[in-house]
């Protein structure tokens, strides 16, 4: 009850409702035996629609520790994109370039610290080499999907959702 009007994320939102009633009712099982694989989407458009859909429910999570983390990630990516634009239009380039490089390095270090053990757990460590090259795309799609998730609409299961 209370999540019927949300188009997706019912599984995650249900787990949070259960946890709100009993903090010990939901546990995480880190085991290769229970990994559930989902087929990837087929196109870039579907990828963005999926990410926008995910972002649209960010403020619906009952776990109040999650939203500040999501907001922080969004703001860091937004700032990186803004700095890049300022550098491209030659606005105080030296200062903004230094700031961009420092923030970009910090973001990359934090994310790789998280990503390495995850990649090894899922036996995907051979894909880690592409991580630095995909950072610009990650910044861009995070800003677009986050903004569209909050203020835009998306297609899901054949219907437009706002």
Language-model features: locations:
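Catalytic donor/gating beta->alpha subdomain of glycosyltransferases that bind UDP-sugars
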Residues: 2-66
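General alpha-helical segment detector with a strong preference for membrane-spanning helices
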Residues: 14-15, 61, 81, 111, ...
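Membrane-embedded multi-pass helical conduit in multi-pass membrane proteins
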Residues: 66-69, 73-152
